[in-house]
């Protein structure tokens, strides 16, 4: 079953256009949304989550157009910090428990502890890396149908990335799908079932990760560097 479908999706800003994008993501799959800064990755994620309206085309989550019903099925981790500075981490867990019916507080507390995040600290007392870990834990502690993670490894020390990868893989609800936007491709490559390369709002390359590795004779990370000449 398709958890996410985009057909001819368009969004234009001054000097930029996300154009005629087609995408399908089915249950159990992880899609890597890959591209340089300014390629349209965050714009696409916001369209999927219903935070901005498309100028054309269609997007659906489990057959639902963006709106309150579809957003209840989506767990979204934005690239930029969205947590209020004055709240304590434990308070955030209680807030999510009250706000989301599918949130699992015991799981969140266990993950926070294993990642070294003190629930008694206020958000403003956390380092950038600890804030990122907290956002990720909150997102992955929901039993969502679709997880949208925008640069989940930003600000996280390399030593913690393997554990975070394990958290992402183990935390997904059964029957869910995951879309992950990242520029740290070598770290995330083991997660990815499918990839979509974006450049200036256009899809340059897409397909199953394993098939692309076989056809091109290189890793997805190496292919990314070749396509974008990094």
What residue ranges belong to the model's regions?
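Helix-to-loop junction immediately C-terminal to a conserved catalytic motif
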Residues: 49
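The feature captures the beta-strand-to-loop junction immediately N-terminal to the Walker
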Residues: 34-36
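Conserved beta-strand
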Residues: 6-9, 16-26, 57
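Conserved ABC transporter NBD signature motif
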Residues: 56-70
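ABC-family P-loop ATPase nucleotide-binding domains
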Residues: 79-134
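Helix N-cap at the start of a conserved alpha-helix in ABC-type nucleotide-binding domains
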Residues: 158-160
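Catalytic Walker B motif of ABC-type/P-loop ATPase nucleotide-binding domains
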Residues: 147-151
